[in-house]
C-alpha cells in the first residue's frame, strides 16, 4: 500500500521506493521534466532549484494537451511536489482544463501558481455530463471502479 511509505509524500524522495527504482521511474521523470524545462527556457524561464530564473520576461501563453498522468508529472515539477500525492488524491475528468500562471513577484525569480484545476464548466455549459473516468468508488460496496 503506497500510503504506508512516507517517501511517497516527499518531493525529493518519492522515487526511492523499491518499486519505483525497479521501474527506473526517476530516470523517465527527469527525462520528461528536463524536456519540459527546455520548452520553458525557450520562453525565457530557466529552472534553478525550485524556481525559475527569468531571462526574458513575457506574457506568452503555452498550451499543453496531455493525459492525466503526464499532466501531474509536469505540474509536480513546476510546484515541487511529489507526483504520487497528486496522482492518487486529485482527479481531473477527461477534457478538463487546468490553468497555471508564472509569477515574477521578485525581479528575475519566477514561480508557478495553479489558478484552476480540472475545470469542466465547458461541459456543463453544453449540458454534457462529466465522465466517471479516473475516479474510483465512493464506498467499497458500490458497483463502481475499485483499486
Residue spans for each PLM region:
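Extended, compositionally biased low-complexity polar/Lys-Gly-rich tracts
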Residues: 1, 62-66, 114
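Phosphate-handling substructures
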Residues: 1-43
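Short hydrophobic/aromatic-rich motifs at helix boundaries and adjacent loops
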Residues: 8-9, 69-72
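A mid-sequence, solvent-exposed acidic-amphipathic segment
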Residues: 30-65, 70
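Acidic, low-complexity terminal tails and accessory targeting/binding regions
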Residues: 46, 50-61, 73-147
Amino acid at each position: 500500500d503506497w500510503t504506508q511509505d512516507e517517501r511517497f509524500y516527499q518531493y525529493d524522495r518519492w522515487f526511492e521506493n523499491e518499486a519505483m527504482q525497479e521501474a527506473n521511474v526517476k530516470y523517465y521523470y527527469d527525462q520528461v521534466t528536463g524536456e519540459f524545462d527546455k520548452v520553458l527556457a525557450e520562453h525565457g524561464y530557466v529552472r534553478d532549484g525550485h524556481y525559475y530564473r527569468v531571462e526574458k520576461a513575457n506574457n506568452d501563453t503555452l498550451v499543453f494537451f496531455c493525459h492525466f498522468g503526464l499532466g501531474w508529472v509536469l505540474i509536480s515539477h513546476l510546484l515541487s511536489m511529489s507526483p504520487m500525492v497528486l496522482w492518487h488524491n486529485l482527479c481531473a475528468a477527461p477534457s478538463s482544463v487546468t490553468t497555471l500562471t508564472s509569477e515574477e513577484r521578485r525581479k528575475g525569480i519566477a514561480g508557478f501558481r495553479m489558478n484552476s484545476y480540472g475545470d469542466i464548466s465547458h461541459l456543463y455549459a453544453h449540458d454534457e455530463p462529466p465522465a466517471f473516468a479516473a475516479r474510483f468508488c465512493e464506498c467499497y460496496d458500490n458497483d463502481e471502479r475499485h483499486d
